[in-house]
């Protein structure tokens, strides 16, 4: 999905730089004048910090505190059993999502606060799989080929709301991060709002959303 988006914007003339770790920023007169990466320095009139669970570390490099905590979630991808429901569904009490994807089945869930740790906790994985037979007794654990066991980090904030807006002390820096478990769902409207903020098109009464609730400095002492 992300690769498809990158390919689309490249066709529109956007330069996408991969494998480029940000190492720091140069600031002058309250603005970022250069972003230093492992593939060279980048100068831009506007900078958008939208790096998911890594946003806090980049914010620190820019002198912008962002209280974002990574919350690990897991998924297990199996060969899709015959006769399985066509639609994705949620096992609400167990907080497990079951998603058919072509000839595969993805079962995901849980929330683990373990910092930037990408290791697989197999007890968490077992708990996800063990939840399924309680709802679908025909599902037999161990009788289906596991194609992939995966974990990812969700960027969570103290109040559950993302950060979205300009940084008061760094005038050309916009933050869009901390969307927790619904980053894909909120991605389109977030992109629209970031564009409006940068272009100066957003009026205070534009759509029924108070961006002050998402202010980057709302937890500042």
Language-model features, listed with the residues they occupy:
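Helix-loop-beta segment of a Rossmann-like dinucleotide-binding subdomain
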Residues: 1-6, 12, 110-113, 171, ...
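Helical element adjacent to the flavin cofactor pocket in flavoenzyme catalytic cores
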Residues: 1-45
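Mid-domain beta-loop-alpha active-site segment that forms a flexible
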Residues: 1-7, 53-54, 124-131, 183, ...
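Active-site catalytic microenvironments for nucleophilic, acid-base chemistry
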Residues: 8-12, 61, 193-201
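Central helical "cap/lid" subdomain
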Residues: 27, 33-85, 121
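C-terminal lid/capping helical subdomain adjacent to the catalytic/cofactor pocket in oxidative enzymes
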Residues: 27, 167-221
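General beta-strand recognition
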Residues: 34-36, 106, 174-175
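Active-site lid/adjacent beta-loop-alpha segment flanking the redox-cofactor pocket in flavoenzymes
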Residues: 61-69, 78-172
């Amino acid at each position: 999905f992300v690769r498809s988006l990158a390919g689309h914007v490249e066709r529109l003339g956007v330069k996408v730089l991969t494998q480029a770790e940000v190492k720091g920023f140069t600031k002058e007169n309250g603005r970022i004048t250069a972003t230093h990466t492992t593939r060279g320095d980048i100068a831009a009139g506007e900078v958008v910090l939208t790096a998911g669970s890594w946003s806090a570390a980049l914010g620190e490099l820019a002198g912008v505190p962002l209280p974002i905590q990574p919350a690990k979630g897991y998924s297990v991808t199996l060969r899709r059993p015959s006769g399985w429901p066509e639609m994705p569904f949620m096992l609400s009490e167990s907080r497990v999502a079951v998603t058919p994807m072509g000839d595969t089945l993805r079962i995901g869930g849980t929330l683990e606060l373990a910092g930037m740790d990408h290791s697989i906790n197999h007890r968490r994985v077992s708990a996800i799989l063990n939840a399924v037979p309680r709802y679908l007794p025909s599902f037999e654990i161990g009788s289906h080929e596991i194609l992939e066991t995966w974990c990812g980090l969700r960027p969570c904030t103290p109040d559950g709301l993302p950060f979205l807006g300009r940084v008061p002390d760094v005038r050309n820096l916009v933050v869009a991060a901390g969307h927790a478990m619904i980053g894909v769902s909120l991605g389109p409207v977030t992109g629209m709002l970031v564009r409006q903020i940068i272009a100066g098109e957003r009026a205070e009464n534009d759509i029924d959303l108070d961006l002050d609730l998402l202010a980057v400095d709302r937890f500042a002492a």
